[in-house]
Amino acid sequence: MTRTAVLLLTLLFLVAMAASDKIKTREVCWNEEECENWE
């Protein structure tokens, strides 16, 4: 594996983690104003 491939995989992983976190927060709060309190 090249370093570029490893970097891309790491970035994809981080983006996926961030996306799943946002989805979890969306389940908890219903509007943007309440979401800010969950960060």
From Swiss-Prot:
Its main location: secreted. Keywords: Disulfide bond, Neurotoxin, Secreted, Signal, Toxin. Residues 1-20 form the signal peptide. Disulfide bonds join 29-35. GO terms for molecular function: toxin activity. Transmembrane segments: none annotated. GO terms for cellular component: extracellular region. Probable neurotoxin. The cysteine framework is C-C. This is Contryphan-Cal4. It comes from Californiconus californicus (California cone).
